[in-house]
Amino acid sequence: MAKNLNSVSFTVLLLVLLVASTEILKSDAACFTFLGECGPEPFTGSNADCLACCVALYKSPPVCAGRVEGVPAHCHCYKS
């Protein structure tokens, strides 16, 4: 029994290391650092319009998301 438990523990450890090293579970949660605002106030477009505005203003590598937030609506740009 202890031998089986040891083998299972070792296998789980290898799987955790594999997932961590290959960043399989990388998510959008890493995109949370506020970069700035874009566009007019209030922003009347969608999240896709906001992202296009952010990419045009700040370029693509730093920008990972553009979201319409707040009242009145603002276009907020985020980087990872």
Curated annotation (Swiss-Prot):
Annotated organism of origin: Arabidopsis thaliana (Mouse-ear cress)
GO BP, one annotated term: killing of cells of another organism
Keywords: Antimicrobial, Disulfide bond, Fungicide, Plant defense, Secreted, Signal
Disulfide bonds, paired cysteine numbers: C38-C64, C50-C75, C54-C77
Record has Acyltransferase as a keyword: no
Lineage of source species: Eukaryota, Viridiplantae, Streptophyta, Embryophyta, Tracheophyta
Keyword match Disulfide bond: yes
Annotated protein name in UniProt: Defensin-like protein 206
Record localization: Secreted
Signal peptide (residue range): 1-29
